[in-house]
A protein has these predicted regions:
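Extracytosolic ligand-binding ectodomains
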Residues: 2-23, 31-399
């Protein structure tokens, strides 16, 4: 993930900041949100229902508001590098901003939905007012049932929008957001007719369906929507070649590891048009492909993650996983809301502030249905790298 500069306050609401070490800022711009009032001069506000039970899991911080976190610290009995990196990011966030406002309780879900549910129950039983995590969709489904039963919100890290719901918010980078950004940019730059070439898998199907829906809402045309089985790109490339004179761009929601074969198939079919993709293309395996030079894709601006990674490496002497900034932002957000949100700091109005928040990867805001909107850049592949051709927005329009 990456960074964004601190956005200005929107409207006439109050902007609250948790200023992080090294210049990182998480901004909480809470227009019309009663849950985002300035902190009292007396310091953190104790929760309306103080937690009296014993703490569970690994704990960080010593604040009055208890927050649970569920991470895949192990998988198949072995340590999980992703889980460890997210745990480290949580520690970094606590040391930066949260030690006096929250007590974070971290439980391992063993990458299992049953264990995720047990972890949620344990943390809620220990007085957690908010659950952060899990990562996997199956775990979110099981853990969110416990959170809903307890009337507590969850900020999860899955990219599967089917697990989002009121009170179950996804902080992750969603396929739908990538598609919306790249299509809107293409249309704003004169592209009116498209082809879609997508793999027959969950990611490709969701992306292609979203592209079709958004194209209709933008009054632009999808001439062909072709799907291919793994390793069988040639036929799809030929279908695109057959309509090449009718299209302005080709959308390819394919993962980085398969893109060399896709690029080869397109080259053999002599397809030459504007290629469009998503953030999974921000990978050397795609950026170095000769056929992909000039392609556009939507992604967070690299500068945010790069700055975070420098601070992470300085503290832990290792490189962070790409998901680490999700854990960092989730803990920072929880700490900031707890510090100034009164007796119910994680209420719906606070979490769904229309002005959103500015974290390590840029601006984001939660929708009432649990999905999110993120500020994304548009990148162009050039010289075996990626350059920003449309910058990440610094704030959201109201509403």
């Amino acid at each position: 993930m990456r960074f964004a500069a601190e956005p200005p306050a929107a409207g006439h609401g109050v902007t609250r900041r948790a200023v992080l070490g090294g210049g990182l800022v998480l901004t909480l711009a809470g227009c019309n949100s009663p849950g985002l009032e300035m902190p009292n001069d007396g310091g953190p506000v104790a929760p309306a229902h103080p937690a009296n039970g014993p703490l569970v899991g690994e704990t960080m911080g010593a604040g009055p508001v208890r927050v649970g976190m569920i991470l895949p610290l192990t998988q198949n009995g072995a340590p999980s590098p992703i889980g460890a990196s997210m745990r480290n990011a949580a520690q970094l966030a606590i040391s930066d901003s949260g030690s006096s406002s929250i007590t974070l309780m971290i439980e391992d879900d063993h990458s299992s939905p049953d264990a995720a549910a047990q972890a949620a129950q344990a943390e809620l039983g220990a007085g957690a007012q908010l659950i952060l995590g899990p990562v996997f969709a199956s775990g979110v489904r099981s853990a969110s049932a416990a959170a809903k039963s307890a009337g507590k919100p969850m900020i999860a890290f899955s990219t599967d929008v089917s697990v989002a719901a009121p009170g179950v918010y996804l902080l992750s980078f969603l396929i739908q957001g990538y598609v919306d950004r790249i299509l809107q940019y293409a249309v704003s730059n004169g592209k009116k007719s498209f082809a879609v070439m997508t793999p027959q898998n969950d990611y490709g199907n969701v992306a292609a369906d979203r592209f079709q829906d958004r194209a209709q809402s933008l009054n632009v045309q999808v001439v062909v929507n072709t799907r291919y089985a793994s390793g069988q790109m040639a036929g799809a490339a030929q279908q695109v070649a057959a309509v090449q004179g009718q299209i302005d761009a080709l959308f390819i929601p394919e993962q980085a590891d398969a893109m060399p074969a896709v690029a080869s198939a397109l080259g053999q079919a002599s397809v030459k048009t504007q290629f469009l993709g998503t953030g999974v293309w921000n990978d050397p395996r795609v950026l170095k492909l000769p056929q992909m030079q000039g392609a556009w894709f939507s992604a967070p601006d690299n500068s945010g993650f790069d700055a975070f990674a420098l601070r992470y490496k300085a503290k832990f002497n290792s490189e962070p996983a790409r998901l680490a900034t999700l854990a960092y932002d989730a803990v920072t957000l929880a700490a900031a809301l707890a510090r100034g949100g009164g007796p119910d700091p994680f209420n719906q109005a606070a979490l769904t502030s229309v002005s959103g928040f500015n974290g390590a990867d840029g601006v984001f805001r939660f929708r009432a249905d649990g999905t999110n909107e993120r500020g994304l850049a548009v990148m162009q592949i050039a010289d075996d790298g990626a350059k920003v051709i449309s910058p990440t927005p610094r704030s959201f329009a109201a509403g």
